[in-house]
Amino acid sequence: MDDNKRPLYLPFAGPAILEAPLINKGSAFSEEERIFFNLEGLVPYAIETIEEQASRAYDQFRSFNNDLDKHIYLRNIQDTNETLFYRLVQNHISEMMPIIYTPTVGLACERFSKNYRRNRGLFISYPNKDRIDDILNNSTRQKVKIIVVTDGERILGLGDQGIGGMGIPIGKLSLYTSCGGISPAYTLPITLDVGTDNPQLLEDPMYMGWRHPRIGGEEYAEFIEAFMQAVHVRWPDTLIQFEDFAQKNAMPILERYKERYCCFNDDIQGTAAVTVGSLLAACKAAGTELNKQRVAFLGAGSAGCGIAEAIVAQMVSEGISDEQARSQVCMVDRWGLLLDNMPNLLPFQQKLAQKCADISHWNNFSDNISLLDVVNNVKPTVLIGVSGAPGLFTEEIVRAMHSHCERPIIFPLSNPTSRVEATPKDILHWTSGQALVATGSPFEPVVVDGETYEIAQCNNSFIFPGIGLGVLASGARHVSDAMLMASSRALAECSPLAINGSGPLLPKLEDIHSVSKHIAFAVGKVAIEQGLSLPASDELLMQSIEDNFWKPEYRRYKRTSF
């Protein structure tokens, strides 16, 4: 029986129900419910459907003149009636996705303390490190299955936002529900408040976090360890997603815990999965394969290197050697092309550095090899930006790339839109509409020579909700590299351009539910094959996906004894 058709038995009544966002219906309580739960007079007389409520809410939403006010309004609905919030977002997903998440969430994070209204999620501050168990038990969510956690140090392209980073876990979990069908009752956003090195926040009298420079070293590592152990004790089967940790911490944390707990880092692995999925779709649309591409990156942090490693793995799976695959991927950061003789490379960068001997014949060889030098010498067919620095894909670079590649694949992925390496409009005009473009943030369609080009948003929201749904449906104990690779291939299978030869590179957001289910099935199937979950047939896995897919519909309530 569909859970939405089962009555929900509640042990409380009156204003307490109206103050509980997971069960509040507002004006949609039936006459019987109003009597049984002592709600008569607490809500207006008219009994409305959820669609009538959503229509009113949408009119109110459209009355606001700026995106931040719209974001605050939607968050207020979320904090009072979650079912209505998700019905409203479901009805207007393309319009509201940029409001509840990127790019608007970046501004919401910057103004978090100034705009704070109501508690959501958990703040675990370092001075309370000995009471983490108590804090987790304070959560009103008893059956948590997905946690998104941040320490606020690298929020989008905005840097250290302290506890203001809480906007990211809240936004990400909103997408787990609206895109992946994860019940909001099973989600919990958490911010680890370990101080901030942002002087503006430390000096801001309204800042609500711990006013202290960020801790590091052993103190930080021990705090993360205590948190992970406490979560595992409280909710042993939960999936933990690490979000917006600084480069120096992101990869070490992932490496330390990915084999111990069910966890993944969306900035590293989710970004890599959606990028590889988009590249596979672009290659199919261009009539080629990924292992034949030459790839140049601008940005060699943990996210960029995570994408590069996923590309290498996919190339190897298509039949070339690991050494050959790595020779086809060039990483450029602020110091130029990564080379194996550079003294200060991080461990995850070392495996992606090019050999000096292999490039000694290049034109304009120097100690600091620029992106333009790489384009002129390597002649890449794929250009990916994860630098967080706007405007670095210049006209000269893009035109140089197009001069040797008829259909260049160009992905300026930095968020938010103010940080993008080049706008789709510029890229398409510089390449006469020939480039295959995907961006990290939403952009309007571009018209070139009378032809309209839809801009694919290479957004992690196409990947992580499906991964989460697949983990929950299969009961996977870990998130393996093979599961992530399966999510990339499943996303590519949903590309309208790859399937039909026309249309956008990635599916429309209106199709996100079917995309997430398709990805969930691929992820769950690999988990079963790898022995990371109990054996199940394809039919049982698909049924489990449907059973776990929550819909924003009101349930009937019945009263139980108090």
UniProtKB/Swiss-Prot annotation:
It catalyses: (S)-malate + NAD(+) = pyruvate + CO2 + NADH; oxaloacetate + H(+) = pyruvate + CO2. It comes from Shewanella sp. (strain MR-4). HAMAP family: NAD_malic_enz. It comes from the Bacteria. Keywords: Metal-binding, NAD, Oxidoreductase. Belongs to the malic enzymes family. It is an enzyme of class 1 (oxidoreductase). InterPro entries: Aminoacid_DH-like_N_sf, Malic_enzyme_CS, Malic_N_dom, Malic_N_dom_sf, Malic_NAD-bd, Malic_OxRdtase, NAD(P)-bd_dom_sf, NAD_malic_enz_proteobac. SUPFAM superfamilies: Aminoacid dehydrogenase-like, N-terminal domain, NAD(P)-binding Rossmann-fold domains. The keyword Nuclease does not apply. One of its GO terms (cellular component) is cytosol. Homotetramer. This is NAD-dependent malic enzyme. A divalent metal cation binds at residues 243-244, 267. The keyword Transmembrane helix does not apply. Its cofactor is Mg(2+); Mn(2+). CDD domains: NAD_bind_1_malic_enz. Its EC number is 1.1.1.38. PROSITE patterns: MALIC_ENZYMES. PANTHER family: MALIC ENZYME-RELATED, NAD-DEPENDENT MALIC ENZYME, MITOCHONDRIAL. The record marks 267 as: Important for activity.
